[in-house]
Amino acid sequence: VGSEMCIRDSLHSGSIFANEQGIKVIDPEFAFYGPMGYDIGNVIGNLFFAWANKAYTGGSAETQTALEQTIRETCDKTAEKLAAEYDKLVTFPLYCASAFRKAYLDGVMADSYGYAGTEIIRRVVGDSKVIEVTSVTDPAQRLPMERALIDLGIYLIKNRAGGLNGAAVTEEFRKILA
């Protein structure tokens, strides 16, 4: 894990505003220089809260499918865009070598999935909970939802370096939900 960019810390869906003109991120006072996988992981991790909430509170199958697709596409398009930007911006010959490029980009995505797992667990068991969890007041719904999220967090942490992608992480969460 290296210091690769200025990251937001605590980045989540509530701090991102997007429209046709661009994207804005609020609360920059939390920013620091660190691994880009941290912010990417926070975004990925936070997307699972909406899906878990709908899965345990009777959300429609259509909504759950849309959330699953959003997560899968976010993971995969992030990896694709990172690779495209790398190819566009990196010019130093050693860093352009295919083995180095692959190791670096795989490392960023491994960090991202690992941080997604820690973000999920932190938001379930820590002091900074999310509304998708706290709004579920029925213990018969909330406890299994929290367990599913923790299980996913553990999976992401343990398997972060195993070449995960959007299909793998959404398939795993479907298995956990079953």
Residue ranges and their predicted role:
Residues 1-8, 19, 134-137:
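ATP-dependent phospho-/nucleotidyl transfer catalytic cores
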Residues 10-16:
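Catalytic-loop signature of eukaryotic-like protein kinases
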Residues 16, 33-35, 52:
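Conserved protein kinase catalytic core
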Residues 27-31:
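Activation of the activation-loop gatekeeper triad in protein kinase-fold domains
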Residues 37-90, 116-133:
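Active-site activation/catalytic loop segments of kinase-like enzymes and analogous catalytic loops
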Residues 94-96:
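Long, amphipathic alpha-helical stalk/connector segments used for oligomerization, subunit docking
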Residues 99-178:
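ATP/Mg2+ or Mg2+-diphosphate-binding catalytic cores
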